[in-house]
Amino acid sequence: MSEKNVVEAFKNGGIIAYPTEAVFGLGCDPDNKEALKRLLKLKQRSPEKGLILLAGSYSQLLPYIDDSKIPQDKRLTLLSRWPDGITQLVPKNNNISSLLSGSFDTIAVRITSQPDVVALCQQTNKPIVSTSANLSGQEPAKTWQSLDLVLSKQVDFILKGVTLGRTSPSKIIDALTGKIIRN
């Protein structure tokens, strides 16, 4: 991967296709509203659903979550689940765009160990938005070679790495209640 080019694409509001734990994701800078709108349009995804933030560390998530609403015991449990392909719903920072959180009071976040994503997050010092690399309702791509032709022509950068080999998309858990939203 050309780290300079992917970082440049990210910082310039580009849409990036990249490997996650199980499937390829599409993402962008979570602070760039135009990029978020473009991503949702590309995916044909309702803005009400919200998106996931994928990070290399918990500190990268802090500007987007309301850490003060997470009790210490729940925070310890939350942190113990990572990095393990588990997405968790946490209280959102009310200053974030509703394009990230959808119609919810929470935001979906995950810390990954996928090395290409960790490197990107470290170089930009922020998380990347994550949604599966497919049109809504279709199967997500598991390799960069299997990206939908329409999608691949509309992204600004394809990180040609590999997934971590998981067989299904991430489990989603409400971090405060422990309720499993998606298994």
UniProtKB/Swiss-Prot annotation:
It is an enzyme of class 2 (transferase). Pfam families: Sua5_yciO_yrdC. Residues 1-183 form the YrdC-like domain. It comes from the Bacteria. Keywords: ATP-binding, Cytoplasm, Nucleotide-binding, Nucleotidyltransferase, Transferase, tRNA processing. Its EC number is 2.7.7.87. GO terms for biological process: regulation of translational fidelity; tRNA threonylcarbamoyladenosine modification. It catalyses: L-threonine + hydrogencarbonate + ATP = L-threonylcarbamoyladenylate + diphosphate + H2O. One of its GO terms (molecular function) is L-threonylcarbamoyladenylate synthase. Its main location: cytoplasm. One of its GO terms (cellular component) is cytoplasm. InterPro entries: DHBP_synth_RibB-like_a/b_dom, Sua5-like_dom, TC-AMP_synthase, TC-AMP_synthase_SUA5. It is found in: Cytoplasm. Required for the formation of a threonylcarbamoyl group on adenosine at position 37 (t(6)A37) in tRNAs that read codons beginning with adenine. Catalyzes the conversion of L-threonine, HCO(3)(-)/CO(2) and ATP to give threonylcarbamoyl-AMP (TC-AMP) as the acyladenylate intermediate, with the release of diphosphate. NCBIfam families: L-threonylcarbamoyladenylate synthase. Belongs to the SUA5 family. TsaC subfamily. This is Threonylcarbamoyl-AMP synthase.
